[in-house]
Amino acid sequence: MVQQGFSIDLILARSREEAADGKDSMSSRPHIPCAPQPLPPNKYAKEMPRRKDGQDVQEHSSWSLGEQGKKLQYSSPSSAALHRSWGSSDDFSSVGSEDDSTEGSPSPMRNSQETETDHRGESPKSDLQRHLRTAFTPQQISKLEQAFNKQRYLGASERKKLATSLRLSEIQVKTWFQNRRMKLKRQIQDQQHNMVPPPVCYPQTFPYYPGVLPVPLNSGSFYQPPAHPFQAPQNSYIPDPRFIPQPLPHHIRMSVALQQQYPPLGLPPGRYFTGLASKNDG
């Protein structure tokens, strides 16, 4: 065995050599990041490789000071590389399994797109069938109009007879009658809307006083409405019952009896002159 000295110079020289060897190894080794680079967002981003404890794969490096000097210590990259390769293999296997599953089972997006294309392909045909209208001949229209003027609602037997006579189907006849009824309803509504209601004339009623002879309406004794709605009435005349003569002459009594027998328009018989007759009888 070769005995080595334990002098300070030998220890310092040995530490310098080890530090130089460490620098050379650092320059020769590839750079390994402490944390993995983030992957671009994709549909498999949720299935990142994780450890059992739930933490991402990370690499740690530590620096420690020894008794003889500063020594650079690195964690062995073999375990990290193995772990990374294991995670990448799992990732690729998961991607492959998903691809196989997607190829084996049709996705809902494809099903929805196929159904939409099917509906789009069928929609023009249905629209054409819906918008097809029956072209009636003038003879058919005239016979249908005659049947409609006689009866607006047809029974099953009558509709069948009419359809066979016109060489039409029962559905066509039924549809024509429905449209004709709607047309008639619109015409009636338009006529009612365009019609102007005639002016309503109400009979003028005047208070009756015993002993007063009927006065013509064109005289100024009764109140007449003003010509302008904002014009105030100038004068009005109401006879005073104190100046009515008592008892009444015979011809006035006869007129009272006639008025009781034939009352004015819109008034029940015996409503007026009852008080006057009782006075005269007394």
Curated annotation (Swiss-Prot):
<dbReference type="InterPro" id="IPR001356">
    <property type="entry name" value="HD"/>
</dbReference>
<feature type="compositionally biased region" description="Basic and acidic residues">
    <location>
        <begin position="17"/>
        <end position="26"/>
    </location>
</feature>
<dbReference type="GO" id="GO:0045892">
    <property type="term" value="P:negative regulation of DNA-templated transcription"/>
</dbReference>
<feature type="compositionally biased region" description="Basic and acidic residues">
    <location>
        <begin position="116"/>
        <end position="128"/>
    </location>
</feature>
<keyword id="KW-0238">DNA-binding</keyword>
<dbReference type="GO" id="GO:0000122">
    <property type="term" value="P:negative regulation of transcription by RNA polymerase II"/>
</dbReference>
<dbReference type="InterPro" id="IPR017970">
    <property type="entry name" value="Homeobox_CS"/>
</dbReference>
<dbReference type="GO" id="GO:0045647">
    <property type="term" value="P:negative regulation of erythrocyte differentiation"/>
</dbReference>
<dbReference type="GO" id="GO:0048264">
    <property type="term" value="P:determination of ventral identity"/>
</dbReference>
<dbReference type="GO" id="GO:0000978">
    <property type="term" value="F:RNA polymerase II cis-regulatory region sequence-specific DNA binding"/>
</dbReference>
<dbReference type="GO" id="GO:0043565">
    <property type="term" value="F:sequence-specific DNA binding"/>
</dbReference>
<feature type="compositionally biased region" description="Basic and acidic residues">
    <location>
        <begin position="44"/>
        <end position="59"/>
    </location>
</feature>
<keyword id="KW-0217">Developmental protein</keyword>
<dbReference type="InterPro" id="IPR009057">
    <property type="entry name" value="Homeodomain-like_sf"/>
</dbReference>
<comment type="function">
    <text>Transcriptional repressor. Acts in a ventral signaling pathway downstream of bmp4, which suppresses dorsal mesoderm formation and leads to both ventral mesoderm and ventral ectoderm formation. Acts in the ectoderm to simultaneously specify epidermal lineages and restrict neuralization. Represses transcription of dorsal-specific genes. Binds to DNA, with preference for the target sequences 5'-TAATGC-3' and 5'-TAATTG-3'. Acts in a pathway downstream of bmp4 and fgf to negatively regulate erythroid specification.</text>
</comment>
<dbReference type="GO" id="GO:0030154">
    <property type="term" value="P:cell differentiation"/>
</dbReference>
<dbReference type="GO" id="GO:0005634">
    <property type="term" value="C:nucleus"/>
</dbReference>
<protein>
    <recommendedName>
        <fullName>Homeobox protein pv.1</fullName>
    </recommendedName>
</protein>
<dbReference type="GO" id="GO:0050768">
    <property type="term" value="P:negative regulation of neurogenesis"/>
</dbReference>
<dbReference type="GO" id="GO:0006357">
    <property type="term" value="P:regulation of transcription by RNA polymerase II"/>
</dbReference>
<keyword id="KW-0371">Homeobox</keyword>
<dbReference type="InterPro" id="IPR020479">
    <property type="entry name" value="HD_metazoa"/>
</dbReference>
<dbReference type="GO" id="GO:0030509">
    <property type="term" value="P:BMP signaling pathway"/>
</dbReference>
<feature type="region of interest" description="Disordered">
    <location>
        <begin position="17"/>
        <end position="128"/>
    </location>
</feature>
<dbReference type="GO" id="GO:0001707">
    <property type="term" value="P:mesoderm formation"/>
</dbReference>
<feature type="DNA-binding region" description="Homeobox">
    <location>
        <begin position="129"/>
        <end position="188"/>
    </location>
</feature>
<keyword id="KW-0539">Nucleus</keyword>
<dbReference type="InterPro" id="IPR050394">
    <property type="entry name" value="Homeobox_NK-like"/>
</dbReference>
<dbReference type="GO" id="GO:0000981">
    <property type="term" value="F:DNA-binding transcription factor activity, RNA polymerase II-specific"/>
</dbReference>
<dbReference type="Pfam" id="PF00046">
    <property type="entry name" value="Homeodomain"/>
</dbReference>
<feature type="compositionally biased region" description="Polar residues">
    <location>
        <begin position="86"/>
        <end position="96"/>
    </location>
</feature>
<feature type="compositionally biased region" description="Polar residues">
    <location>
        <begin position="103"/>
        <end position="114"/>
    </location>
</feature>
<dbReference type="GO" id="GO:0045606">
    <property type="term" value="P:positive regulation of epidermal cell differentiation"/>
</dbReference>
